[in-house]
A protein has these predicted regions:
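A short helix->beta-strand "capping" segment at the edge of beta-propeller domains
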Residues: 32-50
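WD40/WD-repeat beta-propeller blade N-cap
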Residues: 46-53, 87-94, 127-134, 168-175, ...
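Residue-level detector of Asp-centered blade-edge/turn motifs that repeat once per structural unit
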Residues: 58-61, 98-101, 139-142, 180-184, ...
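Conserved strand-to-loop turn within each blade of WD40 beta-propeller repeats
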Residues: 67-70, 107-110, 148-151, 190-193, ...
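WD40-repeat beta-propellers
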Residues: 73-76, 113-117, 154-157, 196-199, ...
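Short loop/turn segments that connect beta-strands within beta-propeller blades
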Residues: 78-81, 118-121, 159-162, 201-204, ...
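Blade-level signature of beta-propeller repeat domains, shared across WD40, Kelch, NHL, RCC1
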Residues: 297-322
Length: 322
């Protein structure tokens, strides 16, 4: 039948409809949907400790350094999982930083940042300026490092002349976490003032703020520039610039630590005693590790192929993909 152009009215002719075709053939099989499979982390090794481990740090691609609540700094060889040596600090270890080979900076519950030569088991010097506990240490380049404290300040230090060259002010409560961003000239801090802040550490300028509902306790960054935050509101947020793109809310307590595994997956450790592995492409949790019996405090993606966790259950656990 031709198209009615509307210029003339077609005759009113009724055409018989063809009979419906009835078939008893069953519908064809549905195509199976592809099933995404994920490798799982399994426990490969465990250290039983005499005190709570508070920090994990990789050394020389094959060693692990730990800090503990009784002030002990221990160095393990992960080729044989043997303790090589240890150093005793006077205060609870909150963070560790290797600035150059054998030279370790410690942040503790005192206001001092101490420098140790671990090969000589000797304290070399102290960096003085903070007024309260030093929670974070980050190496910025071959000359400078940054520290963050419960005194609400971030300090930029010249490692070689032991001087503070800049103080970054803007948070109004304790600062819990600090990372250097991919472009190297910027850092990001997380605070009990319910924000994460981006800074140009070379000028001291605050570049922007990422809001949370509660304390921000953990940070990491992906290779595409996205920042991941976690905190006491039990959520993990993925930020695209200054806009929150995705929120993950499966933890039942504070998210204490975050670890970038390979830019597609991250791990989170929580006060709910669990570690969760997240697929950031699918935006979902693909594994929950429940083998810790107390709060998960720190995570480390070690170049030996281990995801390492420590907990207030006084254990360090080594996980590997199978």
């Amino acid at each position: 039948m031709g198209t009615n152009c509307g210029c003339c009215k077609p005759p009113n002719i009724r055409h018989p409809q063809p009979p419906a075709i009835v078939t008893n053939n069953p519908p064809g099989p549905e195509k199976p949907q592809p099933i995404q499979t994920y490798k799982k982390y399994n426990l490969k090794h465990k250290f039983e400790c005499s005190d709570n481990i508070t920090f994990l740090l990789e050394l020389n691609n094959k060693k692990l350094m730990t800090g503990s609540s009784n002030g002990t700094i221990a160095i393990y060889n992960l080729d044989n999982f043997e303790l090589e040596y240890s150093i005793k600090e006077e205060n609870k270890i909150l963070c560790l930083l290797e600035f150059e080979p054998n030279m370790i900076l410690t942040g503790t519950q005192s206001e001092l940042i101490n420098l140790y030569n671990i090969s000589q088991n000797k304290k070399i010097d102290s960096f003085k300026g903070h007024l309260l506990s030093v929670n974070c240490l980050v190496k910025l380049n071959a000359k400078y490092f940054a520290s963050a404290s419960n005194d609400k300040d971030i300090r930029i230090w010249n490692y070689y002349n032991r001087s503070c060259e800049r103080i970054l002010k803007g948070h109004n409560n304790n600062i819990f976490c600090l990372i250097q961003l991919n472009n190297k000239s910027q850092i990001c801090s997380g605070s009990a003032d319910k924000t994460a802040k981006l800074w140009d550490w070379e000028t001291g300028k605050c570049l922007g703020t990422l809001p949370h509902q509660s304390w921000v306790k953990s940070l990491c960054q992906l290779s595409d520039g996205s920042i991941i935050t976690g905190g006491d509101d039990k959520t993990i947020k993925k930020w695209h610039g200054y806009k929150c793109g995705e929120t993950f809310n499966e933890h039942k307590d504070s998210v204490k630590c975050l670890c970038n595994i390979d830019n597609k997956y991250i791990a989170s450790g929580s006060f709910d005693n669990t570690i969760k592995i997240w697929d950031l492409t699918e935006n979902k949790c693909v594994q929950t590790i429940t083998e810790h019996n107390d709060k998960v405090i720190c995570l480390l993606n070690h170049s030996k192929g281990y995801l390492i966790s420590c907990s207030n259950d006084k254990t360090i656990k080594f996980w590997k993909l199978d």
